[in-house]
Every structure is written in C-alpha cells, then in structure tokens.
Amino acid sequence: AFMTWNTDAKKPEPPAEGLTVDVFIPTYNEDLAILEATLIGCNNMRYPHVTYVLDDGRRREVEELADMLGCRYLTRPDNVHAKAGNINEALKKTSGEFIAVMDADMVPQPDFLEKTLGYFWDPKTAIVQLPQEFYNTDSMQHADGGAHWHEQQLFYHVIQPGKNNINAPFWCGSPSVVRRAALESVGGVATESITEDFLTSIKLNSNGWNIKYHHEVLAFGIA
C-alpha cells in the first residue's frame, strides 16, 4: 500500500537531438497483416530511427514485406534461446545507441520515441518500460472486465507506477526503450530463464543501472 500511495511520476525533458535509435520487432509466425500494422506504426514514429524485423521464422514473405515498407530484415540460422536469443543476435548486427523493442503485434503511437528518449538524459537509465494495452476486447485478458479492463491493468497501472517510486519497476520486454550500452554490459538479454526480461532487470539493477516506468499508453497490441 505504501509503494502505491503516490503513482505520479515526473515526466522527462524532451530528448536530445541526434541520438541513434534502432527499433527491434522480433517475430516468429505472426500473421503478415498483424506484422504489417506494426511496421507501419514503427515507421511513423517521429524521432529518426531505423526499423528492423528480427524474423526467427525465416520467411521470404516477411523479408519482402520489410523491403516494401523500407525496413531492414534480419534473421539467423537457428532459434536458440527464442526471443532473447533473437534480440541478442540483432545486437551484434546493429549499432544504435538506443533500442525500442516492440512485439510483432504492438503498434506504437507517433510520439512514442519523443516521449521516452528524454529519460536517457540520466546516464544511469538503462530501460524505459511502458504499459501494455490492447485494442481488441474479446480476449481472455478481458474475460472478467469486458471492454472496461483487462487482467494486467492492476500490474501496469498500479504496481509498476508504484515500483517506479522506489526505483524498482520491471522490464517487461515490449513496449520499451533500452540503452544498448547497459544491455551489453550485462551480457545482453538473459537466456538462463524463460522470464528473460525479469532476470535482465535484476542483472541491470545489480550492476547500478536504473529502470524507469513511463505511465502512459503509447502502444497497442492484440491480447
């Protein structure tokens, strides 16, 4: 109760100019129409960036879609360590100072980067995590609340903002922005656990890095 007494947080300053930003969209077997909406949304974010499709499905049609939309296509010969391994492999092939991570169904708003990169004025900020929200209301996530709420809202709108007050929010993967240097300093995304984002959070905090929570919905996915 004490942790969640005040969930208001100071909004960051506008971001510095000239930051280099990569956008990672890990995918495996998602429908092309879903992936297309995400790529278009990522391309429409206003801060300069490069969008990468990380395709563990190694699909020709995904490569063609990425090429058509002006995105870069990356793949690898195996699927070792699943999503964590996919992101770690992409780290080796890219160079942006900051990385926005979007699930294949997560469509960001145009101001996503403008509202999150400002947190990185603090040199100890490793990750900015945002709430997960969904544009469909017919899923199991909405079984009890219908169109009014889904089962993760307590976590994303009460617990995470409260943990932000004590400098202890979790990285939840998507949607988020990551400082490359911080992630590389702990060996990339953790591969020793199926909850790789949570374990990576612990490693970052243990090494003096901070995670920030931006309590505003700036991306929508499918539940």
Language-model-detected regions and their locations in the chain:
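Long helical/loop segments within the catalytic core of UDP-sugar-dependent glycosyltransferases
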Residues: 74-98, 110-194, 199, 203-206, ...
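Short, acidic, metal-binding catalytic loop of nucleotide-sugar glycosyltransferases
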Residues: 38-49
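N-terminal membrane-anchoring/stem segments of glycan-assembly enzymes
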Residues: 1-17, 66
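Active-site donor/metal-binding and catalytic loop motifs
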Residues: 215-223
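Cell-envelope/extracellular polymer assembly enzymes that use nucleotide-activated donors
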Residues: 19-22, 50, 184, 199
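Active-site beta-to-alpha loop of glycosyltransferases that engages the nucleotide-sugar donor
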Residues: 23-39, 57
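A conserved acidic beta->alpha catalytic loop
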Residues: 55-62, 78-79
